[in-house]
Amino acid sequence: MELIVLLAVVVAILTMAAARLHYQENITDFLPADEEYRESMELYEQLNEASRIVIIFEGASPDSLCEAVDLFTEQAVASGLNEGRLTSEVDVSAFVERLRFVHAHAPLFLTDSDYQRMDTLFTPEGFRKALAKDKQLLSMPGSGILRDILSSDPLRMFPLSAGASGQYAAASAAFTSHDGYMMTADKTQAFAFYDSPYGSTESRRNAALIDSLQTIVNQTKESFEGMNIRLLGSPVIAVENARRIKRDSLMAIGASIVLITLLLLYSFPHKRDIALIAFSVGFGWLCGMAMLTICVGEVSVIVLGIGSVIIGLAVNYPLHLLVHQRYTTTVRQTLKEVLSPLLIGNITTVGAFLALLPIQATAMRDLGIFAAAMLLGTILFCVIFLPHMMSAKKTPLREIHLPKMSGSFANGLRSNSIRIQHALAALVVLLSLGFGVVLFVNRNESRFDSNLSHLNYMTAQQRTDFMRFEALNSATEGHAGDLFLASSAKEELARRIALWNNWWQGKDRNQLLADFRAAAQEEGFRPDVFTPFEESITKTYTTDVPLDKCFPGKLDIGTLNSRIATNLSDNFDYLGLVCSLIVFVFLCLSFRSLRLAVIAFVPMAVSWLWILGIMQMIGIQFNIVNIILATFLFGQGDDYTIFVLEGALHEQRTGEPMLPQFRQSILLSALIMLITLGVLLMARHPAMHSLGAVTLIGMSCVVFMAWVLPPLLLRITTTNKHKNQKI
């Protein structure tokens, strides 16, 4: 009675703590969390307008498109949307302002290659060619923006200026203005824009905003027959991703519950056993949620979705106890025989998940906290409470039989036949060598996919719209994001100013300016047109510029992506190394025998060789989502290996058959895991689908190695001395 009261009190406390946990949806929590990276990502979103929602109007005539844009704008304002964030024209003011800042601080943005170009630009012939081109560009209709650009940089020293002028004709061919509305050149599409105040990653808040916009879209479409209006942009795609993840998760959870329930009902005739498994895992889940509340207070729902994978690990503990009970006479005997492998497996698995804590990614740390607390809570329930709930009456367990793929092969997996085991060992060695060769040949290829766009889900229509709009938009975009590097470090600013001053050494600025003015006069320009340019040439520059406020960090998108790739790849390598060390050290401490620790560790090492080799051969890569399975597979692999090794040791010491029941519980556990994650192969979201694919490969390799290698390695390495050794 006291134990029931204690359990009720603990559950009540855990439930109250878990209820205080807050949730949010931000997939960037899986990315590095250092301040420099955060600033870079914020800057990237600003420069690339990642929070902008594009409203695409597609109709029969330009006039109907204009009317549709007007009606949409009126309804949007009437519904309470911020009018200042809605526009139907291209906003060039920010672009021009950015250019003016760059031109006013010229040396801070020039690169070594720019100085090589300047050697040919700052000559009488270079002046004449550049100004003749400027005159040609300024004679084009609607060239007002170019006047601002070329008055500050007539020689187009900066690639941004060169791109803006050189792409002007291409932009005219891609877009046109009709009564002040932005349209494609063929006037079949018009565009309006709305800047989300929530950025591109806050999918929960953006979902409400996009629902409001979609309602206005539907109302507008009803007023125009044949009008097609669609939403596009990073916030739209992020919301669609979040919704797709939820739909896929519900599908996977529903299918998993049905299939696992059928499997457990088949294996455990008494519903009481299934309830005990559910109670054990539920207690562990509450422990994980409560620990998240205490440690962080807020968690991504994506973390909890992936955290459901941990159920497959936690279910091992009550499952092993209940399965093994069928082969013993008392609950006490069951605990005596199973407690050691349960605790060893739990400690090594918890240690592997704690390896996630030092990673500089919020979601990874949260997952480590949740998984470690859940597994500890589950094992505590199984050791303290579950034995008192288990029935002393033994009920038969229906065995799960291996499929009849090949009689001798299946029998070999079940039996301890030395001949069959040696044949399987030879197969393992040959395939391991083959996979090793594959990995060596492709050693320079990355096994980590850091391209986040590969994890985005888009409908076919969204993908088509996105590709078309990007193709059109590329004609009008400058390349600030690709070509300029702004650094807040005084040393870098000083170095660039020194480059500028060194380039001018030995050159007569007054003479060069006189040559420039003469060339401008020949082309018919007024003397005061290029005053901003002349001032930038004669100005004295210092490092006392608040450059970090205008460009706080790196604008080089290639460098930013490279940093992401390097950081994530380092995380992957770190996980592999640390998990291996943690598992091996705990195995040594638990078995107190280097030989047994090596026997338990080798199957996991070979499993990873197989996993990486198979993934390399069929073209599957790890990414920021399925990398978490690296820790999970280590945890599951060492659990299975330890149980099989403990069973083999028990048979060696006592002569009593123990492997069959251990293998039976492992097979049942593996089937549950394959069901839990294997159903994700049906998911349409790329990230969740990749979880299913990696799980199918990883679990198959882990179970096969745990099944085959430990008994064989134990038999090979056992001498008379070892037979008498107490473990």
Q: At which residue positions do the language-model features occur?
A:
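Transmembrane alpha-helices and their membrane-interface boundaries in multi-pass membrane transporters
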Residues: 294-295, 307-326, 339, 343-358, ...
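Extracytoplasmic
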Residues: 140-266, 270, 521-584
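Signature of alpha-helical transmembrane segments and their immediate interfacial
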Residues: 1-25, 388, 396-450
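Interfacial segments of transmembrane alpha-helices in multi-pass membrane proteins
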Residues: 247-299, 362, 576-618, 682-683
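Juxtamembrane segments of multi-pass membrane proteins
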Residues: 417-522
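Alpha-helical transmembrane helix bundles of large polytopic membrane transport and channel proteins
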Residues: 67-182, 186-189, 488-537
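Pore- and gate-forming transmembrane helices of large, multi-pass membrane proteins
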Residues: 278, 328-359, 601, 653-684, ...
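Hydrophobic transmembrane alpha-helices and their membrane-interface caps
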Residues: 274-320, 596-644, 705-709, 715
